[in-house]
Curated annotation (Swiss-Prot):
Active site: 165
Organism from which the protein derives: Rhodococcus jostii (strain RHA1)
Entry protein name: tRNA (guanine-N(7)-)-methyltransferase
Transmembrane regions listed in the UniProt entry: none
Gene that encodes the chain: trmB
Molecular function terms from GO: tRNA (guanine(46)-N7)-methyltransferase activity
Keyword Zinc: no
Family annotation (CDD domains): AdoMet_MTases
Pathway stated in the Swiss-Prot or TrEMBL entry: tRNA modification; N(7)-methylguanine-tRNA biosynthesis
Length: 258
């Protein structure tokens, strides 16, 4: 595998805590003004799922205040969070177990979670309500649209992408989220000194991620103190995966500082 900034190989994971498989969808990339640039095959697997009564009740209480659908409009994060604080974007929050734990560990940051799976978001909303976590906001939709249209350039302190779908079949590699254009987009949204933290349990995808990330000129080895934690909680799904011996590779880059 190519040498990569702060790569860590420390165990396995299962994608069950992320998103559940379903029929892939296709879309188009838009620029910041909303004009279509080129066709894009979406990287996520979207699936419908009914909410429990308790989840729906929590959703009805929490969503109007801390949730929003992805749109073409720039996001005013300080107004939404009610404070100006370092902003971290988590792409693909799944059921939100790691999201909630990391937000509680970093009360000084604003954490924005993007997910397409409504039942997963509902579980996260329940955790936020139960544990009274004040520093999480959630977006439902395609993370690429969030990055392209909703996030201001050079506004993010960090981006987390934990266990993106590896799309292991060669004919599906075009659906992978972490490819060169995505790295360029993420880098453009990070502040100087900001951090990109990626984790995957798929060895071949890890190599492809490392190659694409190392080729991005705005990203480099992180040789300064990180503005966000790199410690992830182990979810029950990841714990099960540890038992079968699938290795996790973690990759961390920093945006170059002038």
């Amino acid at each position: 595998m190519p040498e990569t900034p702060l790569m860590r190989d420390n165990g396995p994971v299962n994608h069950a805590d992320q998103d559940a498989p379903a029929v892939p969808e296709e879309g188009q990339t838009k620029d910041s003004k909303g004009s279509r640039l080129h066709p894009r095959v979406t990287s996520f697997r979207s699936r419908r799922g009914a909410l429990t009564v308790a989840q729906q009740e929590s959703w009805d209480r929490q969503w109007p205040r801390i949730g929003a659908d992805v749109s073409d409009h720039r996001l005013d994060a300080p107004s939404w969070f009610g404070r100006d604080a370092p902003l971290i974007l988590e792409i693909g929050s799944g059921t939100g177990t790691a999201t909630a734990a990391m937000a509680k560990a970093e009360p000084h940051v604003n954490l924005m979670a993007v997910e397409v799976y409504r039942p997963g978001l509902a579980q996260l909303l329940q955790q936020i309500e139960r544990d009274e976590i004040p520093n999480i906001r959630v977006l439902r939709g395609d993370a690429m649209d969030v990055l392209e249209n909703m996030i201001e350039p050079e506004s993010l302190t960090g981006v987390r992408v934990f266990f993106p779908d590896p799309w292991p079949k060669a004919r599906h590699h075009k659906r992978r989220l972490l490819q060169s254009p995505t790295f360029a987009l993420i880098a453009s949204r990070l502040k100087a000194g900001g951090v990109l933290h990626v984790a995957t349990d798929h060895a071949e995808y890890a190599e492809a991620i490392a190659e694409a990330g190392n080729a991005e000129p705005l990203l480099t080895s992180l040789d300064w103190e990180s503005p966000m934690t790199h410690e992830r909680p182990v979810t029950k799904f990841e714990d099960k995966a540890h038992q079968v011996g699938s290795a996790i590779t973690e990759l961390i880059w920093g945006k170059i500082r002038s």
